[in-house]
Amino acid sequence: MASLIYRQLLTNSYSVDLHDEIEQIGSEKTQSVTVNPGPFAQTRYAPVNWGHGEINDSTTVEPVLDGPYQPTTFKPPNDYWFLISSNTDGVVYESTNNNDFWTAVIAVEPHVSQTNRQYILFGENKQFNVENNSDKWKFFEMFKGSSQGDFSNRRTLTSNNRLVGMLKYGGRVWTFHGETPRATTDSSNTADLNNISIMIHSEFYIIPRSQESKCNEYIKNGLPPIQNTRNVVPLSLSSRSIQYRRAQVNEDITISKTSLWKEMQYNRDIIIRFKFGNSVIKLGGLGYKWSEISYKAANYQYSYSRDGEQVTAHTTCSVNGVNNFSYNGGSLPTDFSISRYEVSKENSYVYIDYWDDSKAFRNMVYVRSLAANLNSVKCTGGSYDFRLPVGGWPIMNGGAVSLHFAGVTLSTQFTDFVSLNSLRFRFSLTVDEPSFSIIRTRTINLYGLPAANPNNGNEYYEMSGRFSLISLVLTNDDYQTPIMNSVTVRQDLERQLNDLREEFNSLSQEIAMSQLIDLALLPLDMFSMFSGIKSTIDLTKSMATSVMKKFRKSKLATSISEMTNSLSDAASSASRSASIRSNLSTISNWTNTSKSVSNVTDSVNDVSTQTSTISKKLRLREMITQTEGMSFDDISAAVLKTKIDMSTQIGKNTLPDIVTEASEKFIPKRSYRVLKDNEVMEINTEGKFFAYKVDTLNEIPFDINKFAELVTDSPVISAIIDFKTLKNLNDNYGITRIEAFNLIKSNPNVLRNFINQNNPIIRNRIEQLILQCKL
């Protein structure tokens, strides 16, 4: 699992001087600025396979009880109950439309004998005779129908909760009357309901009319306890007010600014025009059969006027998650059939990439706070004639879906001449009328939009909307940043790495096996590994440092500890009462046991603390002398060394990534064995395990207790020639006991002799290992 090279990587045994550290820190800082710009996203890393992603939920939840609010004067909206909590006697509220409706509610405390009291109503002093002999508060609703009329008591509410209610609804004003908890509602007519305003003198709450049952409950039984806590502070009603500001069609807002960079918020109204692409493929033969009718991505370029500005836009429309249908009219050559035709339905998604030549898209490299809102559009299918050689031909007709905006992200459009940083709008679909059918066939009344004629003769479909984003751009608007015309530093490196990966994989066919075995006989270390690089490198030591720092963050460091801990912990935790017969299926006792301790191994992620544990629990043989064993990692290291020497593109910038990838990806399926006297116990990374005798190669029961002792006390050898290959070699050619021992130990001299003799079984095994050394 860890050869000499990878052991050096894990232990990080190299020392560096101050110059190397400064150079490393400087390169990391430069890369960090370019690659990881905080909250910004890079546009050129669009995913390859697009799913619908998150589904935005814009459901608005209206609270049952809103408040409390401070006393105020305002014109209340219709369809809302206003619950007013009176804390003292006197006027609770006054309400009028200055036309035919004047009403005021007066609170009188309990145990008041008949008396005259003065009140100020609508700016005038009024005297009323009041009386309250009960233990509850009384609220007198005083009403008059004209400005010159006198007030009279229209209704009275007796309550121990000191709550009164008022509602504007259906051309009437509704209030509560009677005695709680049996109070009911009643109403007063008015010809001018909308102009009624209210002056409230106490704290109040707001409840939508849809929750009128809750309002009745509060009037009869009082507010819930949480509303009476001293932590609830009444707010001004103005806190509910929304200042409406009509947005401009084009808005460029400076969010922040420094000497070199600034954040600009771009708000744009846009018109999106798009069309579906499709492909109809006909089978050969007599002309009665079609192979495929499918959706294809379609580009569309157009111009439109936006706030006096002429905008040139480009869209690309594609369909994801289509449904495959077919029609088979019979088995005869003259029977009409369609092998596959695509239909977009509710489970499908439409993606529209949009770009225009405005300033918003000029420097769209680092973007945050991206939002959009687009209207829906209905797409109706047309007719497509399946023109048969003879007779009336079938016609696919109809079908419709509606596109609903479901999200937006960054993307890159690739045209014939240029790649464009763009916005990708995602639309969910709902099926609509009409249904589609294939006339003169049994296919009728199906819903969705088939790919036969999705545009229905229209040049394009159109929708409108608006998007907003914040982009990091240069402060100097006159300076044309190269970002818009080139790729970033990381993308240049990715391109180099991709080219290097392709070259490495193609070199697998050119590696001579004898050269590989000879190379494996040498003790490869960091310095010999990097000696073949043809580009200029200042110091091999600094190169090794870069590789180790990259390797330390790789997946291999964690996977090594997980694998080794699973070997020893699983063996020690298994049942010690019986031996386990070898099991070649991936669902084995070994697999289940190793899974049981995976949580423990996963919880430890510190590489530096695990390397000491690895060396104690599992000691791997590296290739040091001709008689010592050679591990899988020695094969992969030898392949890596050979490819580095043969490569024309390797350099100091790409080497750390390539070495790290090679350690993770070379030879993913590996086997390991322990040897004790005449017995071999072998396991692989797929969970298979078995034991066998060296002299006969016959399987024996797998003793997990014995394995638990051997795996911690004996060397573990990587199985270059695995048990399957050994059995095949013995069955076809016959091998001696000494040859079997040497092959089990992965002796390089014996391997080279078999290869020089052109043994097809050994040669094929080594070739397969080389082919597995791919990136």
Swiss-Prot record:
Q: Which Gene3D superfamilies match?
A: 1.20.5.170, 2.60.120.200
HAMAP family on file: Rota_A_VP4, Rota_VP4
Location of region: Spike head:
65-223
Give the miscellaneous note.
Answer: In group A rotaviruses, VP4 defines the P serotype. Some rotavirus strains are neuraminidase-sensitive and require sialic acid to attach to the cell surface. Some rotavirus strains are integrin-dependent. Some rotavirus strains depend on ganglioside for their entry into the host cell. Hsp70 also seems to be involved in the entry of some strains.
Q: Which residues form the signal peptide?
A: none
Residue numbers spanned by region Spike body and stalk (antigen domain): 247-478
Q: Which residues form a coiled coil?
A: 483-510
Organism name:
Rotavirus A (strain RVA/Human/Australia/RV-5/1981/G2P1B[4])
Name of protein: Outer capsid protein VP4
